[in-house]
Amino acid sequence: MRCPYCSYEESKVVDSRSAEDYNAIRRRRECLRCSKRYTTYEKVEDIPILVIKKDLSRESFNKEKIISGLIKACQKRPVSRAQIEEIASDIERNISNKMMVEIKSDYIGEMIMERLKDIDEVSYVRFASVYRQFKDINTFMEEIKNLMK
């Protein structure tokens, strides 16, 4: 690590601690030439995840899209913002832990529905109706029957 004051390349670590919700390490360093101290951050490089959409186009994974869809499905239901964000974070973590570089949107949708089913059945049916593109009342009834099993 190059010293920002004298550009010397060698330093020693004086202090090290977790930062940013344990996603980074904050280090205090001391330059071995000028003895000035400075802070550096070490962070794991995120691997970009691409979502394969139904039309086979690809776009970057965006947790905010999951949150937005959940907010719509859970509108006027007893589901808190914290629960919605927890679902989105769990799904993001699940995808990251599997080291997936590409993931089908269908897989994400199924994970969302699995989580919603346990939290609020009405929100589940709302989300399913958009996600599975229900065309008529019979499709709704089939989904509700499956939910009641």
From Swiss-Prot:
Cofactor binding annotation: Binds 1 zinc ion.
Listed PANTHER family: TRANSCRIPTIONAL REPRESSOR NRDR
Keyword Zinc-finger included in the entry's annotation: yes
Upper lineage: Bacteria, Bacillati, Bacillota, Clostridia, Eubacteriales
InterPro entries: ATP-cone_dom, NrdR-like_N, RNR_NrdR-like
Residue intervals of the ATP-cone domain: 49-139
Family annotation (HAMAP family): NrdR
GO MF terms, alphabetically ordered: ATP binding; DNA binding; zinc ion binding
Cofactor: Zn(2+)
Family recorded in the similarity comment: Belongs to the NrdR family.
Keywords (A to Z) from UniProt: ATP-binding, DNA-binding, Metal-binding, Nucleotide-binding, Repressor, Transcription, Transcription regulation, Zinc, Zinc-finger
Zinc fingers typed unnamed, residue spans: 3-34
Function: Negatively regulates transcription of bacterial ribonucleotide reductase nrd genes and operons by binding to NrdR-boxes.
Name of this protein: Transcriptional repressor NrdR
